[in-house]
Amino acid sequence: MFLLPRFVLVSCIIGSLGFDNPPTNVVSHLNGDWFLFGDSRSDCNHVVTTNPRNYSYMDLNPALCDSGKISSKAGNSIFRSFHFTDFYNYTGEGQQIIFYEGVNFTPYHAFKCTTSGSNDIWMQNKGLFYTQLYKNMAVYRSLTFVNVPYVYNGSAQSTALCKSGSLVLNNPAYIAREANFGDYYYKVEADFYLSGCDEYIVPLCIFNGKFLSNTKYYDDSQYYFNKDTGVIYGLNSTETITTGFDFNCHYLVLPSGNYLAISNELLLTVPTKAICLNKRKDFTPVQVVDSRWNNAMQSDNMTAVACQPPYCYFRNSTTNYVGVYDINHGDAGFTSILSGLLYDSPCFSQQGVFRYDNVSSVWPLYPYGRCPTAADINTPDVPICVYDPLPIILLGILLGVAVIIIVVLLLYFMVDNGTRLHDA
């Protein structure tokens, strides 16, 4: 029993001599069941096409290029592919999901639907989209895109109403006004179908303001009706502003089924693409690496806003992004963050990744995995080790009981042996 305090004391001395096990600013994984979604900074195929071939273009270690655990596309992002004609079919599956993308839709692109629109609304949309994506990928293994087929019984076609620069919105699709309608005060519908996935992320969007057309102002109104369950999802314009508004989107998580898209005023919108979520898993927080430009170009913090514990851990560099290939590709700080993908780690937390699961100087917040259960609390001069007392108390009780049993047995056999000798 006297060995236990000495063991604790020795452990404290070892800790004071240098073992610290702090959380590290990396993304990593518990085992080989992981997947990364990214852009040019992790697009090995894009590197192959550069002339000369130059891996300094990436923040990803090239040793991971043949891992089969990466879905990345130069110049793209999941949000960009979700809404616009500039499309890449991000596809991947894993227990532990990592995202390092988003920079290819920022204030630098200054997207807005109309000349009097607002890029701020689109940054808000981006934040809402990634919030939904991160939350759901904490409970789903598989992500991919699927097309959403729809049937509209009118003669009008979809129109590219919402576009800016090289970006053209095609999800949701706008159905143009029928030729026999003199204005936009009409009701119109279209059927769409979701099948083949466990759940889907789909957009439901409206112009939240007074939309002007030919001297008339319109209030947008859009609904999705699940014909199988009777559930209806809807948005109505509530703002009275006439300028500075844009396309406000909500991102719904819907089950498979037959749906009806309904517009009571202005143009009908209907989803054409969806994030396909498959294979439910035990809750596993996703990891997100900040995706931003060099300070010479304007970035946003929407992935940071979207990534909140307990479903998401956010990792960022403390310095400006300065690449070695060019200012926006090959930054040492972000390369260091991604270097954690080269090895397994036992514990993840809001503060970072722990390399060991025994003791640490920092109590992990929102821990996941096999995490340290003890911490070194350092006063200015004296290191004090603080352990979870319950295991120590229980161990002490068990040792005490064992000693008592041993003593009782020894006394029993000594008395019994003495009796036998006396009888002889």
UniProtKB/Swiss-Prot annotation:
The record's keywords, sorted A to Z, are:
Disulfide bond, Glycoprotein, Hemagglutinin, Host cell membrane, Host membrane, Hydrolase, Membrane, Signal, Transmembrane, Transmembrane helix, Viral envelope protein, Virion
Q: What reaction is this protein's catalytic activity? A: N-acetyl-9-O-acetylneuraminate + H2O = N-acetylneuraminate + acetate + H(+); N-acetyl-4-O-acetylneuraminate + H2O = N-acetylneuraminate + acetate + H(+)
Primary localization class, coarse: virion
- What is the recorded membrane topology of this protein? Single-pass type I membrane protein
Q: Which residues lie on this side of the membrane: Virion surface?
A: 17-392
Which enzyme class, named as a word?
hydrolase
Recorded E.C. number(s)? 3.1.1.53
Task: Please give the GO cellular component terms listed in this UniProt entry.
Answer: host cell plasma membrane; membrane; viral envelope; virion membrane
- The segments labelled Esterase domain 2 in the record are 267-379
| Esterase domain 1, as annotated region | 7-127
Residues at the catalytic site: S40 (nucleophile), D326 (charge relay system), H329 (charge relay system)
Q: Topological domains (Intravirion): residue ranges?
A: 414-424
Cystine crosslinks: C44-C65, C113-C162, C197-C276, C205-C249, C307-C312, C347-C371
Family indicated by similarity: Belongs to the influenza type C/coronaviruses hemagglutinin-esterase family.
Keyword Hydrolase listed? yes
UniProt PTM comment: N-glycosylated in the host RER.
**Assembly and partners?**
Homodimer; disulfide-linked. Forms a complex with the M protein in the pre-Golgi. Associates then with S-M complex to form a ternary complex S-M-HE.
**Annotated transmembrane regions:** 393-413
Q: What does this protein do?
A: Structural protein that makes short spikes at the surface of the virus. Contains receptor binding and receptor-destroying activities. Mediates de-O-acetylation of N-acetyl-4-O-acetylneuraminic acid, which is probably the receptor determinant recognized by the virus on the surface of erythrocytes and susceptible cells. This receptor-destroying activity is important for virus release as it probably helps preventing self-aggregation and ensures the efficient spread of the progeny virus from cell to cell.
Residues in the signal sequence: 1-16
Q: What is this protein called?
A: Hemagglutinin-esterase
Tell me which residues are glycosylated. N54, N89, N153, N236, N301, N316, N358, N417
> Is this entry keyworded Heme?
no
What the entry lists under InterPro entries is as follows: Capsid_hemagglutn (IPR008980), HEMA (IPR042545), Hemagglutn-estrase_core (IPR007142), Hemagglutn-estrase_hemagglutn (IPR003860)
- Stretch list, region Receptor binding: 128-266
